[in-house]
C-alpha cells in the first residue's frame, strides 16, 4: 500500500496529505476556532468530570478521549478516574491501543504505512462489538477491557467487566472520531501541527502526516463535544457545548 495513493478520511487520502505541501501548509482548525476559555491545568480533570456526570443517560456513558500521541489522551483519561469516582460514579478506562489489530495485519504494507495506520491499525469493529454496543442502549453493560497487548501482540484473554448503568467508560486514543463509532460524548485534545512535531517521540514522527490529514478532513475539533487546546498542557483552553441529554446515537461519520 503506497503512501502516495489518494484518499480522504472516508477511504482516500489526497496526494499532498503525506508530502511537503500539507506538512508546510496545513490549515489548523484547532487553533483558529472561537469560544475557547483558559482553564487551570490543575482543575482540568475536575472540570471534565463535572461535565460528564451532568450528562443524563440510561446506560453507561461511553466517552471518547481523542487526541494525538503528543497529547497523551490515555494520561488524561487516567487522571479522570479519581475525580469521577469521587463524584460517586464507577469509572473505567479502555486504551484504544489494546484494540489494535494483530501485527501481521497492521504491518501488511510495512511498519510505517500511513494509510494502514489511519484506517487499519484500530480494530473498530471489535471495539464496537466488545465495548460500545454492550454499553449502549439495550446492551448487557459488560465490556471487554482489552483485546491485545500492543507491546507483545498477544491476546490478553481478559474477562468482561460488568458496570452499573450510571458508570462512565473512557475510551482513549488516537484518530477515534469520524469512524461512525457510537460514543455518547467526545473530547478532542487539539494539538496543532507544529506542536505535534515538537512533542511526538522520534519513533512516532512518521505518523504526523496522518494527524495533519485527520485535522483537515475529519475535522475532530468540529465534531467533538469538548475541545481542549493542548499545545502546552500547562496552559490548556477549552471549548464546551451546552449541557444536554445525549442523543440516541451520537455517532460521527467519516466524510
Where are the predicted features?
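Hydrophobic beta-strand scaffold positions of dinucleotide-using enzymes
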Residues: 170-171, 187
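Low-acidity, Ser/Thr- and Arg-rich intrinsically disordered low-complexity segments
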Residues: 1-5, 12
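Conserved nucleotide-sensing/catalytic segment adjacent to the nucleotide-binding pocket
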Residues: 92-95, 100-152
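Conserved NTP phosphate-binding and transfer environment spanning the P-loop NTPase/kinase superfamily
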Residues: 19-42, 176-255
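Loop/turn-to-beta-strand initiation segments
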Residues: 165-169
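Glycine-rich phosphate-binding P-loop
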Residues: 64-82
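Post-Walker A helix-loop "phosphate-sensing" segment adjacent to the P-loop in P-loop NTPases
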Residues: 82-92
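Pre-Walker A adenine-sensing motif
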Residues: 45-56
Amino acid at each position: 500500500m503506497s503512501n502516495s495513493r489518494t484518499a480522504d478520511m472516508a477511504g482516500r487520502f489526497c496526494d499532498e496529505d503525506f508530502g511537503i505541501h500539507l506538512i508546510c501548509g496545513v490549515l489548523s482548525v484547532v487553533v483558529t476556532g472561537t469560544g475557547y476559555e483558559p482553564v487551570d491545568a490543575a482543575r482540568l480533570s475536575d472540570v471534565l468530570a463535572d461535565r460528564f456526570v451532568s450528562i443524563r443517560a440510561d446506560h453507561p456513558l461511553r466517552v471518547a478521549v481523542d487526541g494525538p500521541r503528543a497529547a497523551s489522551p490515555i494520561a488524561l483519561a487516567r487522571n479522570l478516574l479519581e475525580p469521577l469516582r469521587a463524584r460517586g460514579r464507577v469509572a473505567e478506562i479502555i486504551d484504544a491501543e489494546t484494540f489494535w489489530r494483530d501485527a501481521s495485519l497492521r504491518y501488511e504494507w510495512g511498519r510505517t504505512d500511513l494509510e494502514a495506520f489511519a484506517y487499519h491499525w484500530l480494530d473498530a469493529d471489535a471495539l464496537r462489538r466488545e465495548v460500545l454496543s454492550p454499553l449502549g442502549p439495550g446492551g448487557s453493560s459488560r465490556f471487554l477491557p482489552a483485546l491485545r497487548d500492543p507491546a507483545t501482540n498477544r491476546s490478553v484473554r481478559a474477562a468482561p467487566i460488568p458496570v452499573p448503568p450510571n458508570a462512565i467508560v473512557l475510551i482513549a486514543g488516537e484518530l477515534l472520531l469520524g469512524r461512525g463509532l457510537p460514543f455518547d460524548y467526545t473530547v478532542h485534545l487539539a494539538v496543532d501541527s507544529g506542536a505535534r512535531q515538537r512533542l511526538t517521540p522520534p519513533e512516532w514522527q512518521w505518523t504526523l502526516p496522518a494527524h495533519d490529514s485527520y485535522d483537515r478532513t475529519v475535522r475532530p475539533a468540529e465534531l467533538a463535544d469538548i475541545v481542549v487546546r493542548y499545545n502546552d498542557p500547562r496552559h490548556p483552553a477549552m471549548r464546551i457545548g451546552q449541557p444536554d441529554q445525549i442523543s440516541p446515537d451520537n455517532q460521527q461519520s467519516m466524510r
